[in-house]
Structures are given as C-alpha cells and as structure tokens.
A protein has these predicted regions:
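N-terminal small/polar loop signature for handling phosphorylated ligands or for N-terminal nucleophile
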Residues: 7
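Accessory carbohydrate-binding/adhesion or oligomerization-edge regions at the termini
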Residues: 116-169
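Alpha-helical repeat scaffolds
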Residues: 33-43, 106-111, 141-147
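Structural detector for internal amphipathic alpha-helices that build alpha-solenoid repeat scaffolds
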Residues: 3, 11-30, 41-44, 51-65, ...
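Charged/polar interaction segments and conserved charged motifs
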Residues: 10, 50, 165-169
Length: 169
C-alpha cells in the first residue's frame, strides 16, 4: 500500500493513508508486530513519495520509538521536508539540553549543523535566535541566498512597456 502512494494524487493519497492506518491498527490490535525491517527499508528509499515515507516513519515510531529516533539521525539531508524537519528538531533539542546544562561549547556545533540542514523558515529563524544568544549571530540574508548588492551595467528602457523585448545595438 505504501508503494501505491507513489505517483498518486492527493485524493488517492488520503484513501491509501486511511487503508494503511486501518491495516496497521488491525495488526497491532491482534497482537501482530508490524514488519519493521520492510518499513525501515521503504523509509530509506528516498525515491518514494514523501508522504508515504512519512507514514512509514510514523508506523516505525508507533511500534519502536528507539529505532525511529536512530533513523532520524540519518535524515538531516532527506528530500522529504517533514522527515528533515524532525531530524533537525532532534539536533535543536540536543542543543537545548546542552544549553540547559550551561554547555554552549556542545550546543553551538549542534545548532550550526541544524542550521545547515534546516529548510523550514520558522525553524531557521529559531535556530538563528539560539545561535545569537550564544554569541554567534547568523546573517539570514546570506543564509537564504538573497541578493543584496548588484550593479546596473546599462540603461533599461521600459517606456511603453518595451522591457526585455527591445534589441540594443
């Protein structure tokens, strides 16, 4: 059912997710274990639908939270933004624990690593605030790749909405 989610539209994805949830719930209620090796293998295949992989991760986390936590360590550069966000959050949580123990030497590299892997704007801003609190300000403009300086090398005539269509000699 998880593989069937590859290439499915949103409507079909919702139906397939409900089917997977029903099957998993029935198996767990009957006392049967979920096939963790197959779920982990599916989760590692990044070519599958990100929502299907997220569902596989949730099933692993439901039955074996320790394994799910171990899997997150390898997902800092995952193409699935939801899984990547969880992996980054794990690093941020570790950094928060280090800060609580007044150990900024450990926290700063964790936050730097989290910042390099983060893609969620609110998460990036939160990490930047924590780094600023540790005396390591982050240039968010540079981090996001915004152009802040440029040079105009010639005129640009846009009278009458000519724009780019005009050819200059």
């Amino acid at each position: 059912l998880l593989v069937a989610m590859d290439g499915a539209n949103d409507y079909a994805l919702n139906w397939l997710r409900a089917a997977v949830d029903a099957v998993a719930g029935r198996e767990l209620t009957a006392g049967h274990p979920l096939p963790l090796p197959e779920l982990k293998q599916f989760l590692r295949m990044t070519e599958h639908n990100p929502r299907a992989r997220r569902l596989a991760f949730e099933l692993v986390a439901r039955t074996d939270p320790a394994t799910a936590d171990q899997l997150l360590a390898g997902m800092l550069n995952d193409p699935s933004l939801e899984l990547r966000r969880d992996a980054v959050q794990k690093l941020v949580d570790q950094a928060d624990q280090a800060i609580a123990r007044t150990n900024p030497v450990v926290a700063a590299p964790l936050l730097q690593s989290a910042l390099r892997s983060a893609r969620d704007v609110t998460q990036i801003e939160g990490i930047a605030d924590k780094l600023k609190g540790l005396g390591q300000p982050v240039d968010l403009q540079k981090h996001f790749g915004f152009l802040s300086e440029w040079k105009v090398i010639g005129p640009f005539d846009n009278t009458g909405k000519k724009g780019f269509a005009i050819a200059y000699p």
